[in-house]
Amino acid sequence: MKGFIFAGVLVSALICLAEGKPFDNLELVEDDMLMTKEQKEAYLAHQNGRVRRAALRDRYLWPQGKIPYTFSDDIDQAGRELAERAMNHWMSRTCLRFSPRRREHAYIEFQYDGRCRARVGYTGEARQKVSIGSALDPCPLGSVIHELGHGIGFFHEHSRPDRDEYVNINVNNMREGAESNFRKDNGYFVDSRGQDYDYGSIMHYSKYQGNNAFNAVVMEPIQRGAEIGQRDGLSAGDIRQTNLMYKCNAQGDSELQPVNDEDEDKDGGDSKKKPDPKGPKPGEIEE
């Protein structure tokens, strides 16, 4: 389930987070990405391109790799420890730094809503929810690591514009309504930083995700012997991509600075492309 946020369309999705109703007016995209209607339309508008790796542009990344966080009132001690283990997994392997929120305006909030899902990328407004299941049925650690991947700016790996060179999708084996989980970006939002497709990414779906029958294969790797869908931890590619994305230096700090719209227009991206209304986009909620 991997795909970095490309940085071009998140603004509208930021407005939707009501203080007491965290997912009001948000639509679920690809099972675990939450987006506003406008963000969903923009995301869906960029699915047929050629950029590699599903990673967002700088505008949708957390400045300096610093991510404040809080816990909702319903999160128990076990849930807090689960979230902390997932954050430590990222921090021990990248230059990202999660810290308890003080007065920061933008932050993530861990909560129980019964699902494993999160907003994609940095929106810059209000709190961004990361749901880690429920007290009775918490998400596995690997799934929480995966959801934090969405939160820091990854789409699903199979959302990459070049994914058809690496996996075959069998729509006949999909359950009804699962098609939207297998959309790909057209290169408008995605910036791969020159990295190759990563079968081993923690952001990649398994072969059976979204299937309509037991053991029915929905997504088959083209490379013989390749395994997809692991939830053990970050792959070497995940780590490398994150450190490139957040401009990690030799001291283990992020040199990523805030990017405004004007700077973003000058900083990479394909100006000839337009968002694909049917493609994934920043600010959506993904699982």
Swiss-Prot record:
SS bond list: 95-248, 116-139
Cellular component (GO) terms are: extracellular region; nematocyst
Q: Which residues form the active site?
A: 147
- The answer to whether the entry has keyword Secreted is yes
Give start and end of each Peptidase M12A domain: 53-249
Tissue occurrence: Nematocyte and pharyngeal gland.
Superkingdom classification of source: Eukaryota
GO molecular function term, any single one: toxin activity
Annotated signal peptide: 1-20
* Enzyme Commission number: 3.4.24.-
> Where found in the cell?
Secreted; Nematocyst
- Annotated stretches, region: Disordered: 249-287
Keywords assigned by UniProt? Answer: Disulfide bond, Hydrolase, Metal-binding, Metalloprotease, Nematocyst, Protease, Secreted, Signal, Toxin, Zinc
Cofactor remark from the record: Binds 1 zinc ion per subunit.
According to its UniProt entry, the function of this protein is described as: Metalloprotease.
The entry's protein name is Nematocyst expressed protein 6
Lineage summary: Eukaryota, Metazoa, Cnidaria, Anthozoa, Hexacorallia
